[in-house]
Amino acid sequence: MEKFVITGGKPLHGEVIISGAKNAAVGILPATILAGDVCVIENLPDISDVAVSLKILSVLGAQIRMLNRNTYEIDTTHLTSTNVPDDLSRQMRASYYFLGALLSRFGKAQVAMPGGCNLGPRPIDQHLKAFSALGAEDSVDYGMITVRAKEGLTGAHIFFDKVSVGATMNGMLSAVMAEGQTILENCAKEPHVVDLANFLNMCGADVRGAGTDVIKVRGVERMHGCTYSIIPDQIEAGSYMVAAAATGGDVLIENVTPKHLEPITAKLRRAGVEVEEFDDSVRVRRTGDILPLKINTMPHPGFPTDMQPLMGVLLSVAKGTSTITESVWDNRFRYVDELRKMGANVQVDGQVAVFEGVEKLTPAPLRASDLRAGAAMVVAALMADGTSEIEEIGHIERGYENIVEKLRGLGADICKVDRAPAALESAM
């Protein structure tokens, strides 16, 4: 088992280049199945979720060739299976995108209930609702989800009961080769939803309206390959923005789309942080105190839930009382117990957390309970004077490429080391 060892109290300075978007990559990689051809995907982040997605494609029969660290050639012409292995499905939440892609091309698919972060129930009922409306039947037995369209898929009018990124993306994946037109309403509008639609259209699909409440998909008989570059990662960029602010640093964050960062930028500015925008970069610097905020997470273009733990860490040292209301995911406040170990004064009541700012955080042994909580703990450790250790860092590496190297490049004192096994573990 590995862990991060971080000695904090040093402002971050310098430049950091943002990787491709995880949430776009895990949708676009399954979408290559629809091409039935050769696709070249550029700007793929070198993270474990992408590695699992590529492994799934390989097991299904795709021919995969790495052109460089962030570019892969994927040939899905001759797939040999529509069943995603259980052990791979459970390693990442986004494995459910293989349901929509395989169903669309082959009329059937089987995937285990997805894994990934422990953020409470993440039901896929809205995904199954879309599949059913298009003419598929589904069953869930012993943790395996099976979908099948014996008579093929036919376009339909689908209204999602709640805004869901996953359901919106699976709705597009399953509809692109259905007969006729599909209308998806109450859709998610996140940048990675738009990125998936753009990729599908590059492959010959007819998807219109992505980024709005209503997406219209006109089915096509066949699709083809393309070369496509994934958008920069909005949440990775936001994470480094918060890290710069939290440490009192000055960081230029490159390879970003500033418009995608507007909800984060607005909150940081209200907290007293200077954010300067350029064409494809932002500069974040802080010289004064952090001011208290009220944050309510919402679907895009609201404040992203993935950034909530990171902002919580920042607000733990604000000059006053801050509140965060979590409106998207249950269990998103799991990081608070770890933050309290560092001296933070935080009270959680249901989906609302109240932060009474303290002067500073102190080092502590920490645990990454999920991806974004883990990133928040990294920032907290960077803020604290002294050395902290973070365990269960596999969660963090699911979504952050080269986080140790990137932070070191900004002057952070961080390393990854093997965790010595406990005595009981050694005896087993």
Model-derived features with residue positions:
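Short, structured segments at the rim of ligand-binding sites
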Residues: 1-428
